[in-house]
């Protein structure tokens, strides 16, 4: 599709769609709790719909109403053997976390996904789950999907140090540990998003978190809750970037989740000299209104323990860096290589095609700014964040057209992205 170019200013107010991570987990905990859970503000993107369908296939009654989703939870012991293989679509969150849920079920399940998901290694999850007593068969030594697994009602507890900083792997092991006989200890490499831990407490469970060490006992039961999902800061990041780099812009973003494990993007913007204000802060919901204005940005260095707190925002941060004065260095971000695409290479290729000066490295990028961007043809390769990054980059293009191939990938996390873009574009 041809993208909008040469924007003369952005203005307006947007309500950000529900947080994808919280939407996934609220469906899972609602299904595993006893009673009726209602979820308000859920994201109805393709990834979340994959999770919803998987739990329907596992015997959970889920009603999608206009204002909320209603889940008739069955508990861990109420899941049923599905009549067919579970289709995870493009969702790494779905296949990894549901692997943990299924670890304590004594039936055999096959899980598969699209071409992109079928290239993503699952061994980070399958290796510790096998240690707990789960039988899993995948393709190659990296356990690429499809996965066939048979859980065990006699799961062994585990003490496990995560080899990488990954909230998905951590969460999969937490779901398995909840079904094990005894106490499990999970030790993180770096602190990652803590939505799973928060939701355990919200649904009446318990765990102990001491720094990077998580202790969790098996045999817990959950009680149904009402869940209000805040807006996704990973989706808001694209509008934050647009407001910063398109001249004469001022945007207000409502109901943005500001969980402390997800706000690395705000710290980077501050370090680059960007103007973002927080207001209407709701500490209970961990949400706020963000107001962003056009700013003169400067290069910075991004690495270390902040990386897990902004891993999904690095593509749009790379675009910000192309419009900052000076050099930006991103490091310790090798996790980008095993996302929906190799995001280090694909981000560099896409923005360089538009005139940026980005050098990919083994664990990140070196970006020289400031550069003028021009028209080009860019392929998302099925990666939603590459698509949205390119659409924001196109707003700066004054010469040539920007054509985006496989733009439908954006529906994974933000089905209303282009209508929201239209709403804030002037001139």
From Swiss-Prot:
GO terms for cellular component: cytoplasm. CDD domains: EPSP_synthase. Keywords: Amino-acid biosynthesis, Aromatic amino acid biosynthesis, Cytoplasm, Transferase. Phosphoenolpyruvate binds at residues 20, 92, 120, 168, 343, 385. It holds the Pfam family EPSP_synthase. InterPro entries: Enolpyruvate_Tfrase_dom, Enolpyruvate_Tfrase_sf, EPSP_synthase, EPSP_synthase_CS, RNA3'P_cycl/enolpyr_Trfase_a/b. Its EC number is 2.5.1.19. GO terms for molecular function: 3-phosphoshikimate 1-carboxyvinyltransferase activity. One of its GO terms (biological process) is chorismate biosynthetic process. Pathway: Metabolic intermediate biosynthesis; chorismate biosynthesis; chorismate from D-erythrose 4-phosphate and phosphoenolpyruvate: step 6/7. It comes from the Bacteria. Gene3D superfamilies: Enolpyruvate transferase domain (3.65.10.10). 3-phosphoshikimate binds at residues 20-21, 25, 166, 168, 312, 339. The active site is at residue 312. It catalyses: 3-phosphoshikimate + phosphoenolpyruvate = 5-O-(1-carboxyvinyl)-3-phosphoshikimate + phosphate. The keyword DNA-binding does not apply. It is found in: Cytoplasm. Monomer. Catalyzes the transfer of the enolpyruvyl moiety of phosphoenolpyruvate (PEP) to the 5-hydroxyl of shikimate-3-phosphate (S3P) to produce enolpyruvyl shikimate-3-phosphate and inorganic phosphate. Belongs to the EPSP synthase family. NCBIfam families: aroA. This is 3-phosphoshikimate 1-carboxyvinyltransferase. It comes from Streptococcus mutans serotype c (strain ATCC 700610 / UA159). The lineage of its organism: Bacteria, Bacillati, Bacillota, Bacilli, Lactobacillales.
């Amino acid at each position: 599709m041809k993208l909008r170019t040469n924007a003369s200013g952005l203005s307006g107010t947007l309500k950000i769609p529900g947080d994808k991570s919280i939407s996934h987990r609220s469906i899972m905990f609602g299904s595993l709790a006893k009673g009726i859970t209602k979820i308000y503000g859920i994201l109805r993107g393709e990834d979340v719909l994959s999770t919803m369908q998987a739990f329907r296939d596992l015997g959970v009654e889920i009603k999608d109403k206009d204002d909320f989703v209603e889940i008739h939870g069955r508990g861990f012991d109420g899941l049923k053997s599905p009549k067919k293989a579970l289709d995870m679509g493009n969702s790494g969150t779905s296949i990894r976390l549901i692997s943990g849920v299924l670890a304590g079920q004594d039936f055999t399940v096959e899980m598969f996904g699209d071409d992109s998901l079928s290239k993503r290694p699952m061994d980070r999850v399958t290796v510790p789950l096998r240690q707990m007593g789960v039988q899993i068969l995948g393709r190659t030594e990296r356990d690429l999907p499809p996965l066939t697994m048979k859980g065990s009602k006699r799961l062994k507890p585990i003490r496990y140090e995560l080899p990488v900083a990954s909230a998905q792997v951590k969460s999969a092991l937490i779901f398995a540990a909840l079904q094990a006989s005894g106490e499990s200890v999970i030790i993180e490499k770096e602190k990652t998003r803590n939505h799973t831990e928060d939701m355990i407490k919200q649904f009446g469970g318990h765990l102990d978190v001491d720094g990077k060490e998580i202790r969790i006992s098996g045999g817990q039961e959950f009680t149904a809750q009402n869940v209000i999902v805040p807006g996704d800061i990973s989706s808001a990041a694209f509008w934050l970037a647009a407001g910063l780099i398109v001249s004469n812009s001022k945007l207000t973003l409502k109901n943005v989740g500001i969980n402390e494990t997800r706000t690395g993007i705000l710290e980077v913007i501050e370090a680059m000299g960007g103007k973002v204000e927080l207001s209407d802060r709701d500490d209970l919901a961990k949400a706020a209104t963000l107001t962003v204005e056009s700013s003169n940005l400067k290069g910075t260095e991004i690495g270390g323990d902040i990386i897990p707190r902004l891993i999904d925002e690095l593509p749009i941060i790379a675009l910000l860096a192309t419009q900052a004065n000076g050099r930006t260095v991103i490091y310790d971000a090798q996790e980008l290589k095993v996302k929906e695409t190799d995001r280090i290479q694909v981000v560099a290729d896409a923005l360089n095609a538009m005139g940026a000066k980005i050098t990919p490295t083994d664990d990140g990028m070196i970006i020289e700014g400031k550069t003028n961007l021009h028209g080009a043809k860019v392929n998302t390769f099925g990666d939603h964040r590459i698509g949205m990054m390119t659409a924001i980059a196109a707003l700066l293009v004054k010469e040539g057209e920007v054509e985006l191939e496989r733009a439908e990938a954006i529906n994974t996390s933000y089905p209303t992205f282009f209508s929201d873009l239209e709403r804030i574009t002037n001139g």
